[in-house]
Amino acid sequence: MDYLVTIGLEIHAQILTRSKMFCGCSADYAHAPPNTHVCPVCMGLPGALPVPNRRAIELAALTGLALNCRISNENVISRKNYFYADLPSGYQRSQYDDPLCVDGWVEIEGDHGPKRIGLTRVHIEEDTGKLVHTNDGGSLVDFNRAGVPLMEIVSKPDLSSPEEARRYFQKLRQILVWIGVNSGDMESGALRCDANVSVRPVGQQEYGAKVEIKNINSFRFVERALAYEIERQIRALKAGEPIVQSTRGWDETSGTTVAQRTKEFAEDYRYFPEPDIPPLHLTDVWIAERRAELPELPDARRRRFIEEYELTAYDAGVLTDERAVSDFYEQAVAAARIRGVTPKDVANWMTGEFFRLLKETGETLEIAAQRLRPDYIGEVQELLNQGVITRTSAKEAFEASFREGRSPATIVAERGLAVIGAGDALTDLVRQAITGNPKVVEEYRRGKATAIKFLIGQVMKASRGQANPQAVQQALEQELARE
């Protein structure tokens, strides 16, 4: 029997603000000593009154617009009531009936081509504290994270495989980092995911029981956790066992999902409007201002790179994966065009030597760009186009510019990387190659025309790649004909 898989993801993304969602405490908790970024508001002490973070709401709305959502004019902050050690007040300020953003979508590469994944909502809430488990079985609580602004991005059950879920998660991360609302750091918990999955036999109309997998913090784990859970549910159905709606956790060590509790329903949280925060009214003018903040998004820029710069789909995709890379490329293209260098040539340097050096050094583009100016790419290609340097010398000059922050032209002059053309220097190298390889010379004279390629290689090696290959071949042919 075949089975249909239905998946929906809930992405929890911390909003990049300096202060917390409802108080003035610093939201930068990563390296702070435990429980130092706290106050009566985020600790839930009686009488402490919350004040919504304006910038957090603006960035959440910006996210909704980037995800093709409709922004709600009327918003209500609600209390989500439950008890857990990392929730000091006994409730979480969130949204329920009236979320900030509704009815969006994201396009991904599905299993069978482009696929639009619907979004139910994007709502704002506050993060919880962090539990630290000790070796003796105890647990400690750090409340520095409690109250940090958070968005929950809820997809419709439109995903059909673990691979699609991974691609969707990756696309969301790309967009959130691109527009500057989230760091994308999954290791620190700034971006995490809950996955809902159900399985049903082909032909069955109603969905199977939904199982939620909590707190997944990597693309690889999303795919692995869903693959395992789907297989577990299929095995149970084949054995005639019912699937119970429940919450499970992903155990990366064993590669399995582990039962945690029976799945709660919304009624269990007893949502009600937060009495200390009046409804938020967002005007159409305010929403238009947020829309004006929205930059060109990755998909739109990728399409433009293909059309305007005539890049391949692959190159355009690589160069729009990160906004910093994409912006650097555009700056390099603008400078290169003045020199008659094409956008494709710039793309080749970026996706080739530049990315290789970034990987080799472990640097981010932001760090490397403090040395390598965007116009250096066009400069080194111009020297190559003019025949001043060879491809080998161009790579050497580019790497030196990357590491030293000096112009390619300066490096070419200092290192003597200019092409060795016709003249005494080239003649000397050619004669050395002929003298040092008598057997190859003899083969050439007996009619083996390809033997000259070996001699060309010897000259190029001796010149450290600086000799012009065409000039080398011409000089060799002249010398060999003379002897």
Curated annotation (Swiss-Prot):
One Pfam family recorded for the sequence: GatB_N
PROSITE patterns reported in the protein's UniProt record: GATB
A single BP term in Gene Ontology: translation
Superkingdom of this protein's organism: Bacteria
Enzyme Commission number(s) from the entry: 6.3.5.-
Gene3D superfamilies to which the protein is assigned, alphabetical: 1.10.10.410, GatB domain, N-terminal subdomain
InterPro entries xref list: Asn/Gln-tRNA_amidoTrfase_suB/E, Asn/Gln-tRNA_Trfase_suB/E_cat, Asn/Gln_amidotransferase, Asn/Gln_tRNA_amidoTrase-B-like, GatB, GatB_C_1, GatB_Yqey_C_2, Gln-tRNA_amidoTrfase_suB_CS
A GO MF label: glutaminyl-tRNA synthase (glutamine-hydrolyzing) activity
Alphabetical UniProt keywords: ATP-binding, Ligase, Nucleotide-binding, Protein biosynthesis
Catalysed conversion reaction: L-glutamyl-tRNA(Gln) + L-glutamine + ATP + H2O = L-glutaminyl-tRNA(Gln) + L-glutamate + ADP + phosphate + H(+); L-aspartyl-tRNA(Asn) + L-glutamine + ATP + H2O = L-asparaginyl-tRNA(Asn) + L-glutamate + ADP + phosphate + 2 H(+)
Subunit comment: Heterotrimer of A, B and C subunits.
Function: Allows the formation of correctly charged Asn-tRNA(Asn) or Gln-tRNA(Gln) through the transamidation of misacylated Asp-tRNA(Asn) or Glu-tRNA(Gln) in organisms which lack either or both of asparaginyl-tRNA or glutaminyl-tRNA synthetases. The reaction takes place in the presence of glutamine and ATP through an activated phospho-Asp-tRNA(Asn) or phospho-Glu-tRNA(Gln).
Record-linked HAMAP family: GatB
Family: Belongs to the GatB/GatE family. GatB subfamily.
Name under which the protein is recorded: Aspartyl/glutamyl-tRNA(Asn/Gln) amidotransferase subunit B
